[in-house]
Every structure is written in structure tokens, then in C-alpha cells.
A protein has these predicted regions:
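Conserved blade-ending motifs and adjacent loop-strand segments that build the rim/top face
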Residues: 348-369
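Bacterial N-terminal signal peptides
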Residues: 16-31
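Short strand-edge motifs at loop-to-beta-strand transitions and within beta-strands
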Residues: 457-461
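Short loop/turn segments immediately following beta-strands, especially the blade-tip
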Residues: 128-137, 197-208, 258-265, 342-348, ...
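Proline-enriched interdomain boundary motifs that mark the N-terminal boundary
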Residues: 400-411
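Acidic, Gly/Ser/Thr-rich repeat motifs that build Ca2+-stabilized beta-propeller blades
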Residues: 34-180, 232-235, 240-252, 307-341, ...
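Surface-exposed loop and turn segments in beta-propeller and other repeat-based domains
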Residues: 79-92, 141-157, 203-223, 269-306
């Protein structure tokens, strides 16, 4: 950062916040938990890597084993719920990495699996739908939704599936592996690696999935990008906020945070141009010069041991039994196993502290449908985290409901002489209280500009027209109204006669 940059007050605040995160001891943030958290064993499994519960039954747990099994645990009884070992390749960091049960699982039996397959070496990433029948999930029910090539390396597969607060399926993919994103995938909007993806899997069967309204890059599942290996992410069951644990390379591990309802739509989290709060390398990586803007993490920490650090992102504790842990975000590190928590907020997290527990070889956290949290060790044990209030089960949190929104777009003329400007107006409805809200104009995946709504909730753009083009306008959610996208507006070149 230059001296002139630090002269700006906002840059000073930003620098101070980063310094507090980076040198937490000096800022008094590294504290100890005031109330005891304990581990209660659920049992030992074969290479467990994830745990979740049925949406309507928090005592019906599903433990995911990396080699390809899903084991159901209910009232102390174990059954093999699904067995994908014949199609799962667990070389390197691959395997069956997580599952997500559909919100209507009780009636539909649908669940979604994230795994690396045996068809190719290195393995491709698959996201597939399966259906339970008679208390088990037959392999024959598998329906592939998404295949992502991963041709160079057997690491950085990502692996998280999670339904968001609006009912769409979010998917976390790594950058393709190797060091320093050699293939430049994370910054490439043509690649689905190094991304958070967002799809709607609830289709009529004619198409395998659809792109939900509001995805920022046209007909693409990409929601946000610039991630190295977002192995674990989660949504706050009370507020809907998205928290991502992105595994760093040699220097920093980071937590990225995006409040509901925006959830980081279109965000570029910076990799491989940035690592944590650290700025671009000099000289910049290919494709990074003049890039950005980047969305900084709310927290990062240095690799404690060279070559050994991997953040394990967790959940915001929302069960009342957790005492003063309530509202704090849990995370750990695969190398240290120490369970820690922080207070998630923008622009910087606060109050990072140890919870006084270690889980050797921790690979994941989990959450059941009443907000109780779990820790999973790849060595075999799965634990429930028990707070001072015991094992009480809180009711399902209600997600905030937003009002519907409409964006219109029109042009003074649909035909314009080449290299002349078009006069385009975009407007939103309802208008109440939305003055000053930003509206963006897009040509395909390229944002032409952003303007703020006037008192009658309209904005005007004057793009220069060089060829036939289609525009669309978008408005993000403001916490009251949902995000919305206009129809496409076609502008043609006026031919001389």
C-alpha cells in the first residue's frame, strides 16, 4: 500500500483492521472461551468426512465416509444408507466429500452428493441427485447433474454442498490443484473451478438443473469466484449469511463472509491475485494486473507451520444450549485440530478465541436440523459439540422473507447508427423506499455501468453501440426486496439506405 493510499481515512481504518487480524495478540483478540464446550462421541467410522441430519429429524444423522458410504445413525443404530464405493475415486483429496438433503427430503427422499468419479485420472467432480426408497438409497437412483473436469491434479476438489436460505443448491469447487493455480482457473469465468456455484436442481426432469434468477454471469452456475479451495462453507441458520473457509497456500488461511440476502453474488475473493489480506505478488500473477475489485475476507491467520495449515470452515452456533458461543462462528485447522470461534461481521471479524478443545485430524464440522454442531475426524471419530446447556434442541430458525421485485428496461430507439449512443432507461417496482439503490446494466457477462435510482425509481444509461447487442438490467436485494433481472433488450444497428 502506498503512502498516498494510507492518507485516505478509509484506508487507515482498513489497514488497522487488517493489522488486528494479522497480529491478533497485540490487539487482544486471542482469548479463551468463558464457558466449557465438551465432546460427546457419536461413534467411530471408516474415514468420515462430513455429517448432517434429516431436515425434519435432528436425531437421524448421516455420516459421510470418503470412500463412498453414507451411514445412517439413529437411536444408536447404524445402517448403510447408501454405498457409492463402486463409482467413487478417493485418490488424493478426492472421494465422496459431502451430501445435502433436499428441504423436502421427508416427502421426496431426494439428496445430492458431491464426489469424484472413477471414469478419468485425475478424477472428475460430479454433483448428482439420488432418491431414498425403503430406508436406503439405491445406486440405480443416481442422476448426474453436473460434471466438472479436473484434469491436472488430485487435490483442491472443494467438496461442499449446501442449500441456501432461498432454496437453491450452492456448490464449492477448488481451483484444480497444484500450486498457485497454475491453470488460472479461479479468476476465469469460463471455468467452474475455484468458485461457489448456485443451481436450482428442482426441475421437471427435462433438464437436469436450471440457473436461478439473479445468477450474476448470465446462463452460468457461477455465483462467486476467486477461491482456492472452499472445502467447507455454511449458512447461518438464523440470518442466512454465507461463511466460507478458503484453504490458503503458503501464507494465509481465510474466512470469507457474505450477509443475506446478497450472499456474495458476483464477488471476486481474490485468489490467485491475493491470499488472505495479502496484496498481489510483484510482479502480478498472469491475469491479475489491473484486476479486481476484490472482496476481502473478514479474517485470516498465518500458516503456523510451513507446509501444514488447512482451515476447516464451520458454522455459526445458533442452538441456545451453547451459552456464550451463541452467534459465534466455529472453525478449525486440519493440522492443529484446535477448535476456535470468532464473531462474524463486516468488514472484520472480532473476538477470535480458543474453545479449549482439539480434534486430531479434523476434516469437517456438521450441523443438525436443530442447530447442534458436530466435529468430524478423518481418523474415525465423530463428535457432537455439547455446550453448558446440554443437548437441548431449538426449533428451526425462520429465514427472513423478502418482497418480490421487478426490473423493467426500455430504449428510446431500438435502432441506432453505428458508434452512436443509445438512450436506455431501467426502472424498478415497487418503488417505495428504494431511492438511491444501485442498478447495473449488462451486455452479456460484461457490466456496462451502475447508476442509482432517482426519486421515481429509474436510472438512465447511454452506451455507445458498435454492433447489434442485447442488454439487461439487474438490481440486488436491499434486505426488503429480492434481487431481480430484467428481460433482454435488443438494440440493432440502423442501416443506411
Amino acid at each position: 500500500m502506498t503512502g498516498s493510499g494510507l492518507a485516505n481515512l478509509s484506508e487507515l481504518i482498513r489497514a488497522a483492521g487488517k493489522a488486528c487480524v494479522a497480529v491478533a495478540l497485540l490487539c487482544g483478540l486471542w482469548t479463551a472461551s468463558a464457558e466449557a464446550l465438551t465432546l460427546q462421541s457419536i461413534g467411530n467410522f471408516e474415514g468420515p468426512i462430513y455429517v448432517t441430519s434429516a431436515p425434519s429429524n435432528p436425531d437421524r444423522l448421516f455420516v459421510v465416509e470418503r470412500q463412498g458410504r453414507i451411514v445412517q445413525v439413529e437411536n444408536g443404530t447404524r445402517t448403510v444408507f447408501a454405498d457409492l464405493r463402486s463409482i467413487v475415486n478417493d485418490d488424493g483429496e478426492g472421494g465422496l466429500l459431502s451430501i445435502a438433503l433436499s428441504p423436502d427430503f421427508q416427502s421426496s427422499g431426494r439428496l445430492y452428493v458431491y464426489y469424484t468419479g472413477k471414469e478419468k485420472t485425475p478424477a472428475e467432480i460430479h454433483v448428482a441427485e439420488m432418491r431414498a426408497s425403503g430406508g436406503i438409497v439405491p445406486l440405480s437412483s443416481l442422476r448426474n447433474l453436473l460434471t466438472i473436469e479436473h484434469p491436472k491434479h488430485t487435490n483442491h476438489y472443494g467438496g461442499q454442498l449446501q442449500f441456501g436460505p432461498e432454496g437453491n443448491l450452492f456448490i464449492g469447487t477448488g481451483d484444480g490443484g497444484g500450486s498457485n493455480d497454475q491453470e488460472q482457473n479461479a479468476q476465469d469465468l469460463e471455468s467452474e473451478l475455484g468458485k461457489i456455484l448456485r443451481i436450482d436442481p428442482d426441475t421437471d426432469g427435462v433438464i437436469v438443473f436450471s440457473i436461478p434468477p439473479g445468477n450474476p454471469f448470465g446462463p452460468s452456475p457461477i455465483w462467486s469466484y476467486g477461491l482456492r479451495n472452499p472445502f467447507r462453507f455454511s449458512f447461518d441458520r438464523l440470518t442466512g449469511a454465507l461463511a466460507i473457509g478458503d484453504v490458503g497456500q503458503d501464507l494465509r488461511e481465510e474466512v470469507d463472509y457474505a450477509p443475506f440476502p446478497g450472499l456474495g453474488v458476483g464477488a471476486n475473493y481474490g485468489w490467485n491475485c491475493r491470499e488472505g489480506f495479502l496484496a498481489e505478488t510483484v510482479p502480478p500473477e498472469p491475469g491479475c494486473a489491473g484486476g479486481g475489485p476484490y472482496t476481502d475476507p473478514i479474517f485470516d491467520y498465518p500458516n503456523p507451520n510451513p507446509g501444514c495449515a488447512a482451515i476447516i470452515g464451520g458454522y455459526v452456533a445458533r442452538n441456545a444450549s451453547y451459552g456464550d458461543l451463541y452467534g459465534r462462528y466455529l472453525y478449525s485447522d486440519n493440522c492443529s485440530g484446535q477448535i476456535r470461534s470468532l464473531l462474524p461481521s463486516l468488514p472484520f471479524a472480532g473476538g477470535d478465541r480458543s474453545e479449549g478443545l482439539e480434534v486430531a485430524g479434523i476434516d469437517s464440522f456438521g450441523e443438525d436440523s436443530c442447530g447442534r454442531l458436530y466435529a468430524v475426524s478423518g481418523a474415525g471419530p465423530v463428535y457432537r459439540l455439547v455446550g453448558p446447556g446440554g443437548e437441548s434442541c431449538a426449533p428451526q430458525a425462520q429465514q427472513p422473507e423478502l418482497k418480490s421485485s421487478f426490473v423493467g428496461i426500455r430504449a428510446l430507439r431500438r435502432k441506432v447508427k453505428r458508434n452512436k449512443r443509445a438512450f436506455i432507461t431501467a426502472f424498478v417496482s415497487p418503488c417505495d423506499g428504494r431511492r438511491g439503490q444501485p442498478v447495473s446494466l449488462w451486455e452479456g457477462r460484461r457490466r456496462i455501468g451502475t447508476r442509482h435510482l432517482d426519486r421515481v425509481c429509474s436510472v438512465r444509461f447511454r452506451p455507445r453501440i458498435k454492433h447489434r447487442v442485447r442488454f439487461r438490467a439487474t438490481v440486488k436485494s436491499d434486505g426488503t426486496y429480492v434481487e431481480a433481472t430484467s428481460r433482454k433488450l435488443k438494440i440493432r444497428i440502423l442501416r443506411r439506405r
